[in-house]
């Protein structure tokens, strides 16, 4: 696992490996390139980012609420694996996605998160791209939490989005409250909120443009009592190492 701050190397591998459009999210980001120690060949990419603040199926299973997430700042102790990409033919022929997803739980990533941002990382979210049948199923360290509601708005072209985004910045009085929380931090999914407001102002019914793609939701708890910690029931000193070998390179 090689952490990188080089967008050129990371983006080149990603563009040549995966067809899905990707744009770095606002907030925390750790990028990794996975390299085979023997051959030196690229095996895949990982991005660990600020977690999505609201996914109903996950939040119900964990049992935390907005006070836990924001007042107690437990959302900073969780992250999302927003990129899990194997290179080919590793991905298709050798179940490479399962390997890369398993490496997301490594101690190196947890240590990097704590060193970079000052918060202990106790678990990671991810979602499948299409539907709930996914390569993440059957990985012992990832728990299926349910599915998303499929209520993400379809994005207009980048050209049209930039035009209307700039217009909102200059002309819409409520722009700051649209993309920022009361504490001044960027809300989860700011682009979706901007698109929703664009549609409303243009007289377009947003619900007509949901993609209706229910994605599988997965969570990897790093400790036996991760959920209790996220609910604010215990402190860091009470976290118990997981017995399933999560993050252990030998077991992966």
Q: Model regions: which residues?
A:
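Short Gly/Pro-enriched turn/cap motifs at secondary-structure boundaries
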Residues: 22-23
